[in-house]
Swiss-Prot record:
Protein name as it appears in the record: Large ribosomal subunit protein eL37
Highest taxon above the source species: Archaea
A single MF term (Gene Ontology): rRNA binding
Biological role: Binds to the 23S rRNA.
Cofactor(s) for this UniProt protein: Zn(2+)
Length: 61
């Protein structure tokens, strides 16, 4: 089967699994890298100033 009926089967498997470096559910299984920390793509941990937020809404450094 191809076309529109096949698109409904694309949400069965998990796109992201738990990353073994940062522990977040952001490791892309098909692309073999973590969207959160960059594991599998770079040795340096991917980190930006806008990335982390505390519960009360304040950014942490």
């Amino acid at each position: 089967m191809k076309g529109t009926p096949s698109f409904g089967k694309m949400n069965k498997s998990h796109t992201h699994i738990r990353c073994r470096r940062c522990g977040r559910n952001a490791y892309n299984v098909s692309k073999h890298y973590c969207a959160a920390c960059g594991f599998g793509r770079t040795k340096k941990i991917r980190r930006y100033s806008w990335q982390n937020k505390k519960v009360n809404g304040v950014r942490i450094r």
